[in-house]
Each structure stands twice: as C-alpha cells, then as structure tokens.
Amino acid sequence: MQPSFWHDKWDAQQVGFHLSAVNPLLVKYWPQLELDANAQVFVPLCGKSLDMCFLAEQGHEVLGCELNELAVQQFYRENELAFDISTLAEHQRFHTEQVTIYQGDIFSLDAAEMPNTQAFYDRAALIAWPEEMRSAYARQLAKLVPANSTGLLITLDYPQAELNGPPFAVSDDWVQANLATDFEIERLSSEDVLSENPRFVNKQVSWLTESVYKLIRKG
C-alpha cells in the first residue's frame, strides 16, 4: 500500500473511516488507563479525528501524526482552531494549544521528536495496514512510545477473504503474536458489531468483531 492510496482518498474525500463523532469506546474505556490529566497522548495516523478533541478536553496534550496535509488542515479548520506551522526534520509541525500534529510519514518520525509522550491511542492505525505492512508499523509504534507508556487499541476482525480492506481484519491471535514482545496486553472488550456497520452487511460479511485492548509498553 503506497502513500498515494491515502492521498487519493483524501483528495476525493472518500473518508468513510472518519467518524463524525467521538468514538464511544474511547469515552468508555479511556478512564481505565488511569492517566494524569496532563499526560501527553500520541495518536498515530490521526486523520482529522474528533477523538483528539476529546483527549484535549480531558486535559491531555495531544500529539498526532498524519500523512496527508489536507486531513491536518481540515482538522484545525473544521474545529475552528488557529494554528502555526513549522518544520521539524522531515515533517511539518502544525500546532495549537494542546493539539500538535506532525504531518508526514510515521516511519520517518523519531522518538526524540516526542520525548514527553506518556500514552497513546490507536483506533484507525493498526487496522489501516495490510498484513504485510502491519508488523513494521507495530515495531515503529514500539520505538516511538517510551517504556511504561499506556495505550488504548481498538481493532476490527472479520473474514478477510469476504471483503477487501481497509480497514483490515486484525485478529486477537495477531495482536497477541505480534505485540506481546513489546507490550503487556489486556483485552478489555470484544463485541459483535456487524449490525452497526452497513458496509459490511451490504457486502455480506458473515461476522464482524470490534475489540478494545489496554497496552503497556514493556521496559
């Protein structure tokens, strides 16, 4: 999957992955991370997600990373947030009070550029990668977040042969096999959500499960 895939999606505004409200699973499970209100939270592949606004409203400093510049511009514009732009290594840095977004490739982001991160939130990043690229993303996430940082991960799982991603199917077995080296893993919930997702119903996908995990970066 090339960067042009996502740029084309944003250019055409084919952004069905963008939610028009804060993710209810974030609202429900974020308190279980028991973070300090002022903890810095990293949001990989953040798009223009309203979840960043929710995190900022909890008192957190939010640090996102997003490949597409239009998505970043739309986040600030649609939320009526004034911002300034600077350059940091290979990324453009968009900044307003409490929300900073590095625009560019997450694989060229360096942990030195986000030294104060204490937590992370992944709703749409892990499931955005096809299986052949997913492990590389997981390794990069582990490099970026420091030891003992706590995260919330949301995944979808379904029979991949029945529908082309993204979002791609990520099973509990995959999570355990590929993240356990770097993270302590606790599954907080796993629910059947097929009836709530018309795209999957219309494509006659036989089942769809959404899971929530609490992750802690190992030392």
From Swiss-Prot:
Location in the cell? Cytoplasm
Q: Please write the reaction equations for the catalytic activity of this protein.
A: S-adenosyl-L-methionine + a thiopurine = S-adenosyl-L-homocysteine + a thiopurine S-methylether
UniProt keyword annotation of Cytoplasm present: yes
What InterPro entries does this protein's entry cite? SAM-dependent_MTases_sf, Thiopur_S-MeTfrase_Se/Te_detox, Thiopurine_S-MeTrfase, TPMT
**Enzyme class, one word?**
transferase
| EC nos | 2.1.1.67
Q: Which Gene3D superfamilies match?
A: Vaccinia Virus protein VP39
The organism's superkingdom is given as: Bacteria
Name assigned to this protein: Thiopurine S-methyltransferase
Which species is listed as the source? Shewanella pealeana (strain ATCC 700345 / ANG-SQ1)
